Amino acid sequence: NKFGFFPSVAAGWRLSEEQFFKEAESLSFIDNLKLKASYGILGNNNIGNYPYQSTYALGKAMNYVFGGVYTQGAAVTTYVDPTLKWEKTRTTDVGIETAFWKNKLTFNAAYFYRKTTDILYKPSASYSSIFGLALSQVNTGSLENKGWEFEIGHQNKVGEFSYHVNGNFSIIKNKVISLGVGDVEQKSGMIGNGSNLFLGYPMNMFYGYKTDGVFLTDEEVKEWHDQSKIAPNSKAGDLRYVDISGDGKVDEADKAYLGSKIPQYTFGLGLG
């Protein structure tokens, strides 16, 4: 599947240019009012050259005996997925652009929804070594990003002095929809990069043990749940870990979602 089709479309309606809008005196303070929307599909094939071809290697391990003679051999070293195709990202945007009082005040807002499917990645430790071959790039998993973007600005001129102020604020929510490979949760990432991947949670999440303050005395250590498996020799001043499973001890079963490495809120401010 070396070829792909990635259409896009965008439309806008500037209401402030309509005759009915210009004739409305109550709306004269609005210089610009525009509604806009877009939809598009982007493709990603950033996986190197010829990922759809199997590779062969020469070496002693591939040699073979023919007619009593030890002969140079070659063998396939990489298994290629014959259904490999483009990773696709579908994006929908809707928004509004406004300007008021001779463009002294501007305000823009937009909502976006972005879904990525057939994510390309190359497994490393996610399959058995008994297989005997390396795996090429494969398509698996999907995720979504959605959120809001806001921008507000003010510009003016006082005598010979001109200035402008603008600020922006965005909200984004990231969620793993599918992991492929049977939706097996990846506690160390699909490619062994330490990023925990769980269905319904953000990518690059923090996954670990919850704490409940620190031990104030050694007596508290004795009365607390057994946490010797993760923090042996705990004493006063050490962290107290929560027994989420309720089995009286703190171990691997007590790990939980702690948050995302991807910031949910971002903002900026500009002056000039």
Regions found by a protein language model. Give the residues of each.
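Single, functionally critical "micro-switch" positions that shape active/binding sites
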Residues: 82, 246, 263
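Conserved small-residue
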Residues: 50-51, 138, 157-260
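Short, hydrophobic/aromatic alpha-helical segments in well-folded domains
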Residues: 80, 95, 251-254, 266-270
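Generic alpha-helical secondary structure signal
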Residues: 54-56, 60, 213, 245, ...
